[in-house]
Design a protein with these regions (language model features):
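Active-site-proximal specificity loops/subdomain of glycosyltransferases
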Residues: 39-87, 97-98
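Well-ordered, non-membrane alpha-helical segments in soluble/globular domains
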Residues: 19-26, 73, 99-103
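Catalytic metal- and UDP-sugar-binding loop of GT-A-like glycosyltransferases, i.e.
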Residues: 90
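Conserved donor-nucleotide/metal-binding helix-loop-beta segment in metal-dependent transferases, i.e.
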Residues: 96-118
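Short loop->beta transition adjacent to catalytic acidic/histidine clusters or analogous donor-positioning motifs
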Residues: 3-4, 27-38, 55
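Short acidic, S/G/P-rich loop/turn micro-motifs used as interaction or catalytic elements
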Residues: 12-15, 93-97
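Short, hydrophobic beta-strand segments that form beta-sheet elements in well-ordered domains
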Residues: 35-42, 115-117
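N-proximal low-complexity "stem/linker" segments adjacent to membrane-targeting elements
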Residues: 1-28
Length: 118
């Protein structure tokens, strides 16, 4: 069971610049120890990227009237599809450094329930 589940609802992978940024960020997550990655949504190219990078893909995220994924739905899907002790919602353009997991472990030692914001 991974310690942390990272979950995100990326933008479509249609713009080459955005696609490169998101691919680099998501790849950085997959290189971390003790981490599971879940990508949420039906955006163009998302299923293919998830398969290529070997991460979970859950297309059925609820959205508001403007088509924006609902945070509540994202958390619900992550909780239902993960056995991790920690959940981390993250923007798909954020590269994580190798010390991320160790820092999360240290925070978990300080408090049973916590929220970290960057």
């Amino acid at each position: 069971m991974p310690l942390i589940t990272l979950f995100s609802a990326p933008k479509p992978f249609t713009n080459p610049h955005i696609a490169m940024i998101q691919r680099n960020a998501i790849t950085s997550w997959t290189l971390l120890p003790d981490v599971e990655v879940i990508l949420l949504g039906e955006e163009t190219g998302l299923a293919e990227i998830a398969k290529e990078l070997g991460v979970k893909h859950l297309p059925a995220v609820a959205r508001n009237a403007n088509g924006t994924p609902l945070i509540s739905s994202m958390f619900q899907l992550a909780r239902e599809n993960s056995n991790s002790d920690l959940l981390c919602i993250i923007n798909a353009d954020m590269i994580l450094m190798p010390d991320f997991v160790e820092n999360a472990k240290q925070a978990a030692k300080l408090k049973e329930r916590f929220v970290l914001l960057q």
